[in-house]
Amino acid sequence: MKNTIRRGLCLLLLLAMTAAMAACGQKNTNTGTDEKTMVYAVEAGSAGEEVAKEKGWTVNSVQDQAAALMEVASGTSDAAIIDLLMAGAMIGEGTSYPDLTYTDRLTEEEYGIGCRKGSDLAQYINCVLGDAYQSGTMQKLAQQYGITEELLVPQQEGTFTAGEDSDVSYIQQKGTLVVGITEFAPMDYKDENGQWIGFDADLAKLVAERLGVEIQFVVIDWGQKINELDSKAIDVVWNGMTLTDGVMSAMACTNAYCKNA
């Protein structure tokens, strides 16, 4: 993992109710409200939760970012902190939450993919993503899911060398790549047939295909993602995961593949 990957290149957004929702008996728009008296819905274990706590804000930690939006829409929280990519897919005109809008950009981040500490799967995924980027497949998937190409981090072709205690071999022997996710459009979400799709989901399918195994998506408690990896309940965390210092010290992470700024 390159040392140049730092905490920072995707944006977190502060979402607040618009006046239209306030007129329906919901909480007010928070204009002029002291941010420290507000309640912020955040995904448990996320970079958004970390930022809010660093600022001394009152947080309502929920299962995932979709749940954070629901908290704001129902009036049980004043605002939510979510990723820009999800905000683009989920709020505003023509979306599930047309009366929500974003007000502030808090931090910048980069996304990476997490594997068990010491796992050679991260290197394997780097190679697959390198091929996908160089062939234009990654760019086509980004366009399909409404992600602008400038948000992609260029990937280079590489070679894979299996580790001594190879996680890749373990996954191939058991015949299934188990991917830990939360529902997070446009990265991982279900289509009308109940099948998992999205930018991350489709990239994970490419890795499973290259491995020659089936793929299984498992919804996890985001705050327990490291335990899920270490217990081998899942093989990889692939869900718009921010490359924080804590994540990179606890997991074998891929190179950054997407920005959110």
Task: Give a label for each model feature.
Residues 1-9:
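Bacterial N-terminal signal peptides that target proteins for export
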Residues 19-23:
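C-terminal motif of bacterial Sec signal peptides marking the signal peptidase cleavage site
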Residues 26-37, 45-119:
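Ordered, small/hydrophobic-rich secondary-structure cores
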Residues 32, 42, 50, 55-65, ...:
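Extracytoplasmic small-molecule ligand-binding "clamshell" domains
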Residues 8-17:
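Sec-dependent N-terminal signal peptides
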Residues 27, 46, 88, 107-158, ...:
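Extended ligand-binding regions for polar small-molecule ligands
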Residues 28-33, 86-108, 115, 205, ...:
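Acidic, polar ligand-binding/catalytic clefts
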